């Protein structure tokens, strides 16, 4: 048995490269974790570069002695002081001036998770032994905040009165030790942990013991969700409101949560209390959010999110002190343009906060009975996430272990195939690297007038300023610094524009040319699924009275074109 030929180049591969946590503060060092595999002992040069678009804005170099097998290393590089900004990280390993391997990832410079709420959920709290590994698997997704869904004993009493594992109201087994381990693991990974906390009501045993805390419809029937959770009186100083706020505070104090996800149920919008008082929920929610945020603010960094179900009541709560705006979309908001319209509306009223869109793909659940529809259902997940990101929002779709949410009850989430999970993960990493170009709250819409797109044969390609089926959706914007940004989302092969439907996977396109009146060189373009999201400088053709024509790089599904700093 012989070893590798010492005269040949070593076989070396970068197996993983990712930030030690999803975000770091501007002006502080960022840490990068790398796993390298090599077939022999070798001395290499490692160069780590920090990239703003395609410009190197920081670089560090090291000499590494690698031994055979797998080696884990940590690198550090200083981030610029620019607030709320995304960067690429590129690690190159060289020997004798020749590159042996290269790996890339993204990192965000943030004041806190709420500036980039890349949201996911945990649903399984049966045992603590696998919790740390489960949380670590969120790292490649650049998740910044995790909601602990249905972690509590009851909706009216979060901590169990009994020691050890319990059954929740729907019969699921929950270990408080697993919940605590999950929170601890999130903190170790730099991820915020939010406790799910229902606003809407309590189980039957509670309202049977407190009948005056129920609310009713106009016919005097108690309002409930499937006769399981009963809506309760949320008026200021009501017993239920005081209890709810105590439970929120106790969850953060006793379990270490970083805040609470305040869940509502949308309909109904009105109710009658036991004493005959009529009220609108939208009149009560702003004060409740303010009270909850104030109660949790005893420790810096604690925040609340509030679920505007079907967008209700966004305008009423938009100025309340929630960490970000969170909207859960349901019919009649069934088209891509409805999703984008909600993002744009939230941007107008949201006081420069990030926007999370919870939108679930029931087509994925339905496809399990029709296996040949499964790829199209998974494409629906990826395409919707792309539309939301191109529109400036964050998609709430991810549960632990690469599962996608298919309905409002999160434990029903279903696993994506490895290839689809990889595609979706690439889109999320892309959103992290370019967050200041995609989800910057102060992006201003820009017109798409005069933009022309042609294929490699010179034929015109239909475009639309709305995400309409049969077209390439164009979304143009200006950054606060005045740079133009243009997203192109390819919907040409879709037969309709419903977001919760089996979708056709778009083909890779090459040789397209685009005319961009008013855009000035240098111009770069990038796609999540081309060259790991790395920008490519565009070649401009001859200038005409209609402006420059640019050749676009090969891409699939979504391309982002940006004016670089002049």
Protein language model regions, located:
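Aromatic/acidic polysaccharide-binding cleft in carbohydrate-active enzymes
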Residues: 264, 353-450
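Carbohydrate-binding surface patches
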Residues: 458-520, 557-561
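Aromatic-lined substrate-binding rim segments of carbohydrate-active enzymes
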Residues: 152-202, 276-285, 291, 295
């Amino acid at each position: 048995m012989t070893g590798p030929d010492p005269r040949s180049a070593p076989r070396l591969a970068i197996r993983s490269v990712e930030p030690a946590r999803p975000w770091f503060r501007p002006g502080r060092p960022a840490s990068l974790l790398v796993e390298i595999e090599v077939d022999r002992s070798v001395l290499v040069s490692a160069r780590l570069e920090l990239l703003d678009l395609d410009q190197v804005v920081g670089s560090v170099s090291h000499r590494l002695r690698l031994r055979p097998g797998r080696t884990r290393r940590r690198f550090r590089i200083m981030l610029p002081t620019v607030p709320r900004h995304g960067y690429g990280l590129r690690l190159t390993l060289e020997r004798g001036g020749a590159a042996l391997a290269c790996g890339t990832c993204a990192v965000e410079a943030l004041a806190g998770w709420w500036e980039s709420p890349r949201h996911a959920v945990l649903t399984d709290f049966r045992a603590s032994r696998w919790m740390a590994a489960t949380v670590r698997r969120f790292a490649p997704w650049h998740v910044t905040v995790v909601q602990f869904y249905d972690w509590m004993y009851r909706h009216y009493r979060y901590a169990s009165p009994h020691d050890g594992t319990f059954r929740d109201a729907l019969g699921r087994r929950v270990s408080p030790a697993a919940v605590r381990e999950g929170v601890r693991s999130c903190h170790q990974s730099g991820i915020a942990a939010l406790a799910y906390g229902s606003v809407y009501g309590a189980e039957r045993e509670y309202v049977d013991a407190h009948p005056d805390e129920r609310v009713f419809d106009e016919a005097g029937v108690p309002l409930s969700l499937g006769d399981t959770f009963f809506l309760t009186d949320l008026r200021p100083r009501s017993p239920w409101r005081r209890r709810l706020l105590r439970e929120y505070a106790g969850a953060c104090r006793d379990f270490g949560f970083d805040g609470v996800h305040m869940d509502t149920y949308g309909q109904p919008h009105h109710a009658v209390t036991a004493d005959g008082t009529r009220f609108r929920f939208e009149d009560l929610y702003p004060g409740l959010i303010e009270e909850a945020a104030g109660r949790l603010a005893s420790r810096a960094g604690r925040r609340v999110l509030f679920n505007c179900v079907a967008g209700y009541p966004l305008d009423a709560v938009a100025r309340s002190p929630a960490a970000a705006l969170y909207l859960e979309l349901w019919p009649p908001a069934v088209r891509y343009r409805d999703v984008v319209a909600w993002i744009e509306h939230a941007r107008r009223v949201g006081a420069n906060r990030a926007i999370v869109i919870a939108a679930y793909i029931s087509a994925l659940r339905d496809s399990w009975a029709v296996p040949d529809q499964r790829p199209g259902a998974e494409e629906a997940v990826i395409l919707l996430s792309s539309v939301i990101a191109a529109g400036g929002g964050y998609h709430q779709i991810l549960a632990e272990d690469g599962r996608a949410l298919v309905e409002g009850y999160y434990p029903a989430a279903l696993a994506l195939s490895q290839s689809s999970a990889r595609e979706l993960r690439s889109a999320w990493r892309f959103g992290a690297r370019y967050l200041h170009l995609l989800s910057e709250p102060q992006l201003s819409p820009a017109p798409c007038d005069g933009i022309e797109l042609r294929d490699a044969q010179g034929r015109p390609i239909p475009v639309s300023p709305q995400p309409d089926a049969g077209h390439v959706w164009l979304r143009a914007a200006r950054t606060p610094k005045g740079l133009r940004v243009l997203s192109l989302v390819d919907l040409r092969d879709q037969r309709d524009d419903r977001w919760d439907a089996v979708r056709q996977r778009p083909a890779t396109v090459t040789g397209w040319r685009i005319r961009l009146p008013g855009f000035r060189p240098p111009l770069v373009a990038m796609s999540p699924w081309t060259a790991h999201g790395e920008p490519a400088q565009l070649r401009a053709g001859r200038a005409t009275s209609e402006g420059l024509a640019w050749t676009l790089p090969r891409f699939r599904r979504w391309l982002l074109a940006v004016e670089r700093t002049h």
